[in-house]
A protein has these predicted regions:
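Internal helix-loop-helix
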Residues: 8, 12-83, 123-130, 256, ...
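Short Ser/Thr-interspersed hydrophobic loop/turn segments at strand-loop and sheet-helix junctions
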Residues: 15, 38-43, 135, 151-157, ...
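Short glycine/proline-enriched turns and hinge-like loops at secondary-structure junctions
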Residues: 30-32, 98-100, 124-129, 143-146, ...
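A short, Trp-centered hydrophobic/proline-enriched beta-strand micro-motif
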Residues: 82-90, 134
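Glycine-rich phosphate/pyrophosphate-binding beta-alpha loops
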Residues: 95-96, 120-126, 167-168
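A structural signal for short hydrophobic beta-strand segments in well-ordered beta-sheet cores
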Residues: 104-107
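A short core secondary-structure module
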Residues: 116-162
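Glycine-rich beta->alpha junctions and the first turn(s) of the following alpha-helix
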Residues: 159-261
Length: 270
């Protein structure tokens, strides 16, 4: 991990990190097509893929989409330099793949939120510095409406992290326990009870970018134009000529249609 942090810093110093991230946050402010060319040139060289995957896909992208200006200025340059590694606090022991069934709670107490609950199957939590956490903030509305996203350091008082050893000996996954963990409201991502909106975009970034050989390529999709349709993003990046690019665009469109249908059902109280 230390070596990958070093490689990420070398990329940053050489102007090769955050190619599509706005210059105001330490990036180069270029296009996905520029990053695609860089990815091809980097083939065969040492990379920081292990730390980039959870950090930049999708955490950095979510910060670009929904972070406040102060949050972006504070964290994105540090991410690009390899000084901050991020993870996702999403899955829970009792929720399976239904993220909207999150039972980890966040209760407001003045300018802070108090988190209690647990998360599981988090990749790389043992070496990360910060995380995005989906928590339940309102039990009196349909489940998709009562969620909020927070960012928090992994070493806050009240947080316990345990590595999970798989049958093959792999220990990359972790589980975490939150006991009266206090998070400032300033570290909330997006509006209160609108976490599902954030999460939908969050999952879009993760799914679109998961199979990229160098996850730094699509990190700046938001910077390349917030609401840009996936088809246009893929075309600008030169990915419409490969099967993976077309598959991802098709899957993204399908997810958009499903999300729209679910949104209508939730609004109708179904």
């Amino acid at each position: 991990i230390a070596r990958e942090r070093e490689v990420q810093r070398l990329l940053f110093d050489a102007g090769l990190a955050g190619v599509c991230v706005p210059r105001a946050y330490g990036g180069q402010g270029l296009t996905p097509a520029h990053q695609r060319v860089l990815d091809e040139e980097l083939e065969g060289y040492e990379s920081a893929l292990r730390i980039q995957s959870p950090t930049m896909t999708p955490c950095l992208a979510v910060l670009l989409d929904y972070g406040t200006e102060e949050q972006k200025q504070r964290h994105i340059p540090a991410i690009l330099r390899g000084e901050e590694l991020w993870l996702q606090f999403l899955s829970e022991p009792t929720s399976g793949s239904d993220l909207a069934s999150a039972r980890t709670t966040a209760v407001r107490d003045g300018d802070e939120w108090v988190l209690n609950g647990s998360k599981i199957w988090t990749t790389g939590a043992w070496f990360s510095d910060w995380g995005l956490c989906l928590a339940r903030t309102n039990w009196d509305v349909p489940k998709h409406r009562g969620l909020t996203v927070f960012m928090l350091p992994v070493d806050l008082p009240g947080m316990e992290l345990r590595r999970i050893e798989m049958l093959n000996g792999n220990r990359e996954f972790c589980e975490e326990f939150f006991t009266d963990v206090r998070v400032p409201d300033a570290d909330r991502i997006g509006d209160v009870d609108q976490g599902w909106t954030v999460c939908t975009r969050w999952m879009f970034h993760e799914r679109m970018l998961h199979n990229s050989p160098y996850v730094t390529w699509p990190v700046g999709m938001r910077a390349a134009g917030g609401g840009t349709p996936p088809f246009e993003i893929a075309r600008a990046a030169g990915r419409l000529d490969d099967d993976e690019g077309r598959d991802l665009v098709g899957e993204s469109r399908m997810l958009e249609l499903v999300a729209a249908e679910l949104k209508d059902r939730v609004a109708a109280g179904v």
